[in-house]
A protein has these predicted regions:
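Terminal helix/beta-alpha structural elements that buttress the NAD(P)+-binding lobe
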Residues: 1-138
């Protein structure tokens, strides 16, 4: 698996089992260095305008999914998913089992008291957060 991110996130990507590649300019070349024949699938979770590159790397629109770029998906014919709300309870139960077994963890990047919700929102909008932002309710 190949994961893209800033150099500051590369150790984390390795911890997740991915080979890190810098995102942004040169991303395609970095992926090609690791996968000269391209990749089997590409998942866009950032919505940063890379769908044309992902289509080329994955060999076509049928091998690309985005959860972050609705307009780009329409423009390029890529599948877009918001998830399947009908399966949400089933998936939540599965995640709970994985957490209990120690096979899944969700890293917390930063916590905020509910009164600081505006600051939490600003931090999230700025990006570059590793882990989830959590609002604490007293």
């Amino acid at each position: 698996m190949i994961g893209t991110g800033s150099p500051a996130t590369h150790d984390h990507l390795r911890e997740l089992g991915a080979e890190p590649v810098n995102y942004g300019e040169g991303m395609s070349e970095g992926v090609r260095a690791l996968a000269p024949e391209g990749v089997n699938w590409a998942l866009d979770v950032a919505g940063s305008g890379v769908l044309p590159e992902l289509i080329e790397l994955a060999g076509g629109v049928d091998h690309v999914l985005t959860i972050a770029d609705f307009a780009g998906a329409q423009k390029h014919g890529v599948r877009f998913s918001r998830g399947d709300s009908g399966r949400a309870l089933y998936a939540l139960a599965e995640v709970g089992d994985l957490v209990e077994a120690g096979k899944f963890s969700l890293p917390v990047g930063r916590t905020f008291p509910l009164a600081d919700v505006a600051e939490a929102h600003r931090v999230g909008e700025a990006g570059h957060v590793r882990g989830k932002l959590v609002l604490l309710v007293d």
